[in-house]
């Protein structure tokens, strides 16, 4: 199963602070435009959507893939195509000395060399299942407009290039199918803006911003073409790619009233094909943002509605040849914090242009999976509890609230202490260490619950369960 996994000869590990004890912000200069979180949330009224949301909230841990033509040279994602000033330095670093026009020609041309001959979707799905992931978010199309599915409405796709005769040329179909077979909930990432589409960026005009490069009010017929193009592609994904649970829409500047793509109609039509579909129109509160998506950050406090932090494992969304990896501790601690605050954690991985998931990714995910096999009861299918944090300890609860879980998030570079303590959440009887089922008595010291730790425990995050006195 590992024959197509590359072993890196030199790895630089970046043990980035997890933000476990305060709000974490993991954005770096290598990331593109970073979305915030919506200020408001509107609960859905459709019973099937509410049911699906509840099921999704049980899953807690999702794998997100950014994979496209940007993976060939290893340039994170497609934001360098945008001529806004914030991306100028990035373009110069990628293609020194090139004009913006030359850069665009070079970037569009990457489609001619994207040939992921080592892509094995079943292998990906098996790896991610073993790592403890429960749902998938896969980039069917980023802002560059390159489709990772065989769209009938454009030739700018993986199925029309060098990989057209590949075993899995309709990539998204095979990714969804492989992960679905492993029991994953399936999410289709789709970019609302499409910079390759002539009815969004007219190739005869300059492209000074991320927005349409023509006046929509003056050329409504051109914008109508784009509305239809978007509706057609989403309908393809909803009709021809099996059961889809989440429609994850990126590009929050495409919204009413200036860039109205008639999303209400699109989502209504999608739910005729996919009943209960969760719509995630990022950063746009209302009927089509069924859960919120703080990007590269964790909210400061608990939220009482559905949300997901999407954070990269490295310093970029897509694959890059010089990655800075976050640690196993960071992944586990971040998952504990997000879960205690009521969210789900979508961890992003970028496969290479060949379709390879790097060995250093696998090493980390394998260890995370082992931890979750022993301690996952404290994560999966849990809900929030009011007293959810004390120092390095995060608390979750089972659905009836009668069992609490305490997760000690071991800080990077530290050893387990002699004891763990917290205030509140007093156990009713002994506490159980999930990794081995052993029970411990607790004591009260200075108004705190204290648990003495035995010697010989592996130096990693610990999870305990106990009944409450409430």
Predicted regions and their residues:
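Bacterial Sec-dependent N-terminal signal peptides
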Residues: 1-25
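Mature catalytic domains of secreted/periplasmic carbohydrate-active enzymes
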Residues: 23-470
């Amino acid at each position: 199963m590992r024959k197509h996994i590359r072993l890196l000869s030199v790895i630089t590990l970046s043990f980035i602070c997890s933000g476990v004890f305060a709000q974490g912000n993991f954005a770096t200069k290598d990331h593109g435009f970073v979305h915030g979180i919506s200020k408001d949330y509107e609960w859905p009224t459709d019973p099937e959507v509410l049911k699906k949301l509840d099921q999704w909230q049980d899953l807690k841990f999702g794998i997100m893939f950014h994979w496209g033509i940007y993976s060939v040279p290893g340039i994170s994602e497609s934001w360098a195509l945008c001529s806004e000033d914030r991306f100028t330095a990035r373009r110069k670093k990628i293609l020194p000395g090139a004009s913006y026009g030359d850069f665009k020609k070079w970037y569009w041309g990457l489609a001619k060399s994207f040939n992921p001959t080592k892509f094995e979707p079943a292998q990906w799905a098996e790896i991610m299942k073993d790592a403890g992931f429960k749902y998938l978010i896969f980039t069917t199309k980023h802002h560059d407009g390159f489709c990772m599915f065989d769209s009938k409405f454009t030739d700018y796709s993986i199925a029309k290039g060098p990989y057209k005769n590949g075993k899995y040329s309709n990539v998204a179909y095979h990714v969804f199918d492989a992960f679905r077979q492993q029991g994953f909930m399936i999410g289709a990432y789709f970019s609302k803006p499409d910079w390759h589409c002539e009815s969004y960026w007219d190739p005869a005009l300059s492209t000074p911003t991320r927005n349409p490069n023509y006046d929509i009010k003056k050329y409504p017929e051109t914008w109508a073409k784009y509305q239809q193009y978007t509706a057609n592609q989403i309908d393809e994904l909803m009709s021809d790619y099996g059961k889809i649970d989440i429609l994850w829409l990126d590009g929050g500047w495409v919204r009413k009233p200036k860039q109205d793509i008639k999303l209400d109609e699109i989502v209504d039509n999608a739910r005729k094909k996919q009943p209960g579909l969760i719509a995630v129109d990022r950063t746009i509160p209302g009927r089509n943002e069924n859960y919120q998506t703080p990007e590269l950050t964790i909210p400061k406090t608990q939220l009482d509605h559905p949300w997901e932090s999407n954070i990269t494992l490295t310093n970029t969304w897509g694959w890059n040849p010089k990655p800075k990896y976050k640690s196993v501790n960071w992944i586990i601690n971040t998952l504990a914090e997000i879960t205690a605050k009521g969210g789900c954690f979508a961890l992003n991985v970028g496969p290479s242009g060949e379709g390879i998931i790097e060995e250093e990714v696998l090493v980390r995910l394998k260890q995370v999976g082992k931890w979750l096999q022993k301690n996952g009861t404290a994560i999966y299918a849990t809900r929030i509890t009011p007293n959810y944090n004390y120092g390095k300890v995060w608390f979750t609860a089972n659905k009836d609230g009668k069992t609490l879980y305490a997760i000690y998030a071991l800080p990077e570079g530290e050893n387990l202490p002699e004891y763990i303590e917290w205030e509140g959440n007093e156990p009713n009887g002994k506490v159980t260490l999930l990794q081995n089922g052993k029970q411990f008595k607790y004591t009260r010291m200075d108004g705190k619950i204290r648990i003495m730790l035995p010697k010989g425990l592996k130096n990693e995050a610990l999870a305990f369960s106990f009944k409450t006195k409430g």
